[in-house]
């Protein structure tokens, strides 16, 4: 809903960057549509604006499934890649590190001529496999360490992984963040009653303040300097978007 996001941006004073592309759930009405045809729609979102508005996308997104890039999501990945090649906008990638799915995604991007220094492989702190994460970084990509507090790996171990990557010399391409969901449907309890708060709020009561209240103090305790924290949370995201 680009109009809603524009209203929130104006009311809050926060710069919200709209996304074009598609997430994990491939819609039935797009089955059989070619990557080139999809790319035309994504490019229109960037150059003209989302349909019925003059609000333009500033970043491209694609996704993979848990174990691999399905045939349908490969079409979407190639469409996103072609959109990037045409527009030069950065590409954020929903990935699953537990299956090392980024290896398949990066292969597709190479085939499509993507500049891998404009790619960010997200949800990467769902693993502590440092060698796999280094491999992604060695391809030129940014690493989205963006599932705080997360569930598959403890918040502290996510930060330990982040610190290990900083120590290994990759600090200029790491982007820690929340992947926080603040609005979602309330699900009833087994007895049919409604909970007083959403499960996401119970899991992460700090919501968008989690990084500030939990992660940055943890990093400082590990010896990460203020300058390095500035690089992680300000300089790296800016460089990723600006190119």
What function would you assign to each model-found segment?
Residues 7-10, 15-90, 141-142, 147-152:
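Active-site gating/metal-coordination segments in enzymes
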Residues 71-75, 98-113, 129-137, 162:
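Distinct, well-ordered alpha-helical segments
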Residues 84, 143, 179, 229, ...:
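Divalent metal-coordination and catalytic microenvironments
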Residues 87-90, 110-117, 135-144, 170-172, ...:
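Glycine-enriched alpha-helix->loop->beta-strand junction motifs that scaffold or abut catalytic
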